[in-house]
């Protein structure tokens, strides 16, 4: 805890040594930025304004401000925020503790002129030893896809790859909380001599369309449209075009590896290797087990409910409505539970009906129903080209053991001997070296994308793609 020489709390005081122009400092802790400004009014009183961009707080004015040559305390009543810090290096920096929503983070702030973008050291930065182009192409349903094409220096043609994103609307860089993993992959591979195409998802960035109305099959068609675009580029070696997919994008990559004659290699990054019903069960079980305060008994109780619902959705033919059979399965499960179990899964005070309504809405969607009926046996045994499958052993979204094992078994079933499967220790679903390895931790980790995973990809591509071109 930081301490102060003064104990009086005043709503406004004169800022020692400050002029009428504002002074500003900014710091970052994980994926959270803090930006504080101190300024003096014409009447000579001092004011503090705080911005927390990732928490949608912009220039909140301090209700209480205590300043000295050594320290600052600013309290923001409405937002229930406390900023407590000590000045260093002639007030060029502040070591601070910022408390929001009952949680305290430590920040090292430096003096700035204005709010700066969120920063992660592993994100690529210029100058880049390659050419970048903003490109557009048309997919099915007249979707206008926008993306970035990176082209190596030198004389082509070059082998090429398209990066395919996972579940959820993502921009071309795969941006989450300031991390840009797809940009990092593209930067690395382009430096290794590959053309790389990465694109905004439907309804994201500069790509039109409605993401929520699309299915995995639609995403596969969007990726094929990107491959078709690559084939038209004179810099592309059309005999060596590959797909690199993350999570659901890994599933799409495996589908295209089976169905598209244009694909010459496949890289699955935490890609789904089991059927849709199993991935739902594996994922929810893994997430629950890593949730703070979740006991094994409560995991069992939640999974009993979830598995009942998943099994029912999976059993209903796609052309038939879900509402009645799902309602019956849900009511039957509730009727069979004791009061302790219903309380454990938060089914009290009408919350059971709220839960059912939300789940029914999700389960009735085209994407969900196609996903839960996905069967990798329809695709992976038909892949007869080089495949690299990577997973982190701390992945709770696409658990590594079961998914990698299934990919291997299905490749073997089809007679494919050109594959490499690697389970990477200590990495989560986003290929970050994790600590607690929970979903909540992901945004705050410094890793953007594992250097080890990139090295494996680069080595494998040299051996299986670039060597083959010579």
Residue ranges of predicted features:
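N-terminal cap/lid segment of alpha/beta-hydrolase-fold proteins
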Residues: 30, 114-156
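Short beta-strand/loop motif that positions the catalytic acidic residue
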Residues: 383, 389-391, 395
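Central antiparallel beta-sheet cores of small beta-barrel/beta-sandwich binding domains
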Residues: 22-87, 93-100, 182
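Alpha/beta-hydrolase active-site loop
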Residues: 213-234
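Short amphipathic alpha-helix adjacent to the substrate-entry channel of hydrolases
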Residues: 175-196
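Short beta-strand element of the alpha/beta-hydrolase
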Residues: 157-167
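Accessory cap/linker subdomain of secreted extracellular hydrolases
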Residues: 269-381
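Conserved alpha/beta-hydrolase "acid-adjacent" motif
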Residues: 396-402
């Amino acid at each position: 805890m930081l301490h102060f020489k003064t104990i009086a709390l005043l709503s406004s005081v004169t800022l020692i040594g400050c002029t009428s122009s504002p002074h500003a400092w900014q710091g970052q802790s994980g994926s959270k930025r803090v930006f504080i400004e101190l300024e003096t009014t014409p009447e000579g009183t001092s004011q503090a304004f705080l911005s927390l961009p990732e928490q949608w707080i912009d220039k909140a004015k301090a209700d209480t401000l205590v300043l000295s040559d050594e320290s600052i305390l600013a309290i923001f009543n409405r937002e229930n925020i406390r900023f407590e810090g000590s000045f260093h290096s002639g007030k060029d920096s502040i070591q601070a503790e910022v408390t929001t929503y009952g949680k305290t983070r430590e920040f090292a702030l430096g003096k700035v002129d204005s709010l700066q973008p969120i920063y992660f050291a592993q994100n690529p930065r210029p100058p880049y030893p390659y050419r970048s182009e903003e490109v557009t192409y048309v997919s099915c349903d007249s979707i206008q896809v926008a993306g970035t094409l990176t082209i190596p220096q030198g004389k082509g043609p070059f082998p090429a790859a398209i990066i395919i994103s996972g579940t959820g609307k993502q921009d071309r860089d795969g941006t989450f909380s300031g991390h840009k993993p797809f940009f990092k992959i593209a930067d690395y591979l382009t430096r290794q001599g590959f053309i790389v195409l990465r694109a905004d998802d439907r309804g994201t960035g500069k790509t039109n369309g409605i993401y929520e109305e699309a299915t995995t099959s639609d995403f596969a068609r969007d990726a094929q449209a990107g491959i078709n675009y690559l084939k038209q580029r004179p810099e592309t070696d059309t005999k060596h075009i590959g797909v690199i997919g993350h999570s659901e994008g890994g599933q799409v990559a495996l589908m295209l590896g089976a169905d598209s004659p244009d694909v010459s290699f496949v890289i699955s990054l935490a890609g789904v290797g089991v059927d849709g019903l199993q991935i739902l069960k594996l994922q929810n079980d893994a997430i629950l087990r890593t949730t703070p305060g979740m006991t094994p008994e409560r995991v069992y109780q939640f999974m009993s409910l979830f598995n009942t619902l998943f099994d029912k959705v999976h059993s209903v033919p796609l052309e038939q409505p879900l509402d009645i059979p799902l309602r019956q399965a849900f009511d039957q499960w509730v009727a069979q539970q004791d009061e302790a179990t219903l309380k454990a899964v938060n089914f009290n005070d009408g919350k059971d009906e709220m839960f059912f309504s939300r789940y029914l809405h999700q389960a009735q969607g085209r994407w969900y129903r196609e996903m839960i009926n996905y069967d990798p046996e329809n695709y992976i045994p038909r892949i007869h080209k080089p495949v690299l499958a990577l997973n982190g052993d701390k992945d709770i979204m696409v658990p590594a053991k079961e998914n990698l094992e299934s990919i291997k078994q299905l490749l073997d079933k089809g007679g494919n001997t050109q594959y490499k499967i690697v389970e990477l220790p200590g990495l989560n679903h986003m290929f970050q070296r994790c600590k607690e390895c929970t979903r909540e931790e992901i945004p705050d980790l410094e890793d953007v994308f594992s250097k080890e995973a990139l090295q494996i990809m680069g080595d494998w591509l040299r051996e299986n793609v670039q060597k083959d071109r010579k």
